[in-house]
Amino acid sequence: LANNISEKTFDLVMTDTKFLANVIKYDRYQPEFYEDTKTYVSKRSSTKKLNKGIDFYLNNKDLINIVENKFEIEKELLLSLMGIETNYGTYVGKMDILSSLATLSYDKRRSEFFTKELLILLKLIDENQIDYKSLYGSWAGAFGFFQFMPSTITVSYTHLTLPTTD
C-alpha cells in the first residue's frame, strides 16, 4: 500500500472509518476566515483563561521548562497556543480524526493536503508510534494539547509525558 503501510494496519484502522458530513460544514465555516483578528482574539482570551494558564504553568513548570529549553520555544508561546487550541488540555476534541481525515481527503477542496496527513497518520499507526484507538481531536484531524496535525510528528519525535486532564 501507499507509504509502505501494511495491509493489516490499513484494514484494522479503516474498518470503522466513515464519511462525516459535518466535517465538510466545519471546513467551510472556520472562524479564522470570517472573524477579524480583534474579534477572534477577544473571544479566545480572558482574565480567567490567563489565570488558568498561570495555574497550568505552576503545576507543570518542570516539564514546560524542559520543552522550552529542548525545542527553543518560549514558554509563553507554548502556553498561549495550548490555551487557544485546547484550553490547557481540557478540551482536545471528540472527533474521530481518522474519519475526519478520510472525509477531508475525499472532499476535493484540499484533498491532496488531507490525503497526505491521513497517510502519515496511518504510517505512524503502522509503526506503533500512535495508538489508533486514542485518536480523537478536531474536525480537521489535529490532536493533542497543541492540536498538531500528523505531519508535525516525525519518526524521531521526542516523547514527553504531559499531565492528564481527568
Feature locations, PLM:
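Acidic/His-rich structured neighborhood in mature extracellular/periplasmic domains
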Residues: 42-157
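A very general structural signal that marks isolated residues within well-ordered alpha-helical segments
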Residues: 87, 164-165
